[in-house]
């Protein structure tokens, strides 16, 4: 009889065992749904990671897009265009033989600063002729030494 009274009091207060069971069922269902959603997310994430790690495709068009620009500037104002070409990852050959020595030096200083900032390289090919190469291009100096030693081209006047 005491249990009947206790059940009635709990029913009035709202603490029936049936309510607890329903509440526990709801909590368990929510946890199961949450686990399913997180499992799907983790599974998709793992699938993406495994496909990226197995992907060894190299874009072959990157090497063919290298362009060479040959410039013979008439004044210092063309320095920005030369450096823009370098910034756009183009190889630039600059001939400053027709410029005044002071203007050529200013232009060379500007190009040297730009190539340094862009991790490029500035090489003197001949007196007054310079090669600016972007960071994605490697320049070999062996050819110049070989040609000079064989006297085919006298690069070192």
Swiss-Prot record:
Keywords: Cell cycle, Cell division, Cytoplasm, Septation. The keyword Cell cycle applies. One of its GO terms (cellular component) is cytoplasm. Its main location: cytoplasm. GO terms for biological process: division septum assembly; FtsZ-dependent cytokinesis. It is found in: Cytoplasm. InterPro entries: Cell_div_SepF, Cell_div_SepF/SepF-rel, SepF-like_sf. Homodimer. Interacts with FtsZ. Cell division protein that is part of the divisome complex and is recruited early to the Z-ring. Probably stimulates Z-ring formation, perhaps through the cross-linking of FtsZ protofilaments. Its function overlaps with FtsA. HAMAP family: SepF. Belongs to the SepF family. This is Cell division protein SepF. The gene is sepF.
């Amino acid at each position: 009889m005491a249990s009947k009274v206790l059940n009635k009091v709990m029913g009035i207060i709202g603490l029936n065992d049936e309510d607890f069971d329903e509440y526990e069922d709801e909590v368990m269902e929510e946890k199961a749904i949450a686990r399913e959603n997180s499992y799907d997310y983790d599974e998709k994430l793992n699938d993406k990671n495994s496909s990226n790690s197995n992907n060894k495709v190299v874009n072959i068009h990157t090497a063919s897009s290298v362009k060479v620009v040959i410039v013979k500037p008439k004044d210092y104002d063309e320095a920005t265009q030369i450096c823009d070409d370098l910034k756009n990852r183009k190889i630039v050959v600059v001939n400053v033989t027709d410029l005044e020595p002071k203007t050529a030096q200013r232009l060379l200083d500007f190009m040297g600063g730009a190539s340094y900032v862009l991790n490029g390289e500035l090489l003197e090919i001949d007196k007054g002729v310079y090669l600016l190469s972007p960071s994605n291009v490697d320049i070999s100096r062996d050819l110049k030494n070989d040609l000079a030693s064989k006297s085919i081209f006298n690069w070192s006047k």
